């Protein structure tokens, strides 16, 4: 939770730290690229403070792009400090999915060109939390705890498949 990432070389005689990066003051999520041909080439970390995510070189953790998550909620209200909750790497496309907690937006981050970064935001439900993939690795399911909903993203089509009311405080694990 201290927003410090460590890259450890497990192939060394004695595994050791080979790179370190501090991406903020407090963080919850880190992920690496999973799409075929891009495996572990890009790393991403999302922070609670400052409200941002950082894209890094997967071999060195050298920062390549920092993106602030400040913006509008799904209710069209400005939120100055939306924290980054879950981050997952798509298996369908070279993209990360980033939950901006308080805004209720799921960012789809295309990492093929970090200089000209392509971002798409999907409206889900406020207070996004944790999530994961279904068994096909096509659908990302994520809980919106305080909204009592589960959002489902079709990562093959890059669109919201459903936002499902589920009762009280869904929590994936």
Language model regions located:
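Predominantly soluble domains enriched in secretory-pathway, periplasmic, or organellar proteins
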Residues: 1-173
């Amino acid at each position: 939770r201290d927003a410090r990432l460590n890259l450890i070389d497990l192939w060394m005689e004695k595994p050791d730290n080979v790179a370190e990066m501090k991406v903020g003051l407090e963080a919850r999520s880190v992920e690496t690229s999973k799409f075929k041909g891009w495996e572990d080439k890009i790393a991403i970390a999302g922070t609670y403070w400052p409200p941002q995510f950082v894209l890094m070189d997967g071999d060195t953790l050298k920062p390549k792009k920092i993106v602030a998550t400040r913006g509008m909620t799904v209710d069209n209200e400005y939120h100055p400090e939306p924290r980054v909750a879950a981050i997952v790497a798509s298996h369908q496309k070279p993209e990360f999915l980033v939950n901006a907690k308080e805004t209720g937006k799921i960012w789809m981050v295309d990492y093929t060109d970090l200089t000209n970064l392509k971002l798409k935001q999907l409206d889900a439900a406020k207070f996004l939390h944790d999530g994961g993939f279904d068994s096909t690795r096509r659908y990302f399911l994520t809980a919106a705890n305080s909204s009592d909903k589960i959002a489902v993203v079709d990562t093959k089509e890059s669109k919201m498949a459903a936002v499902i009311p589920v009762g009280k405080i869904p929590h994936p694990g």
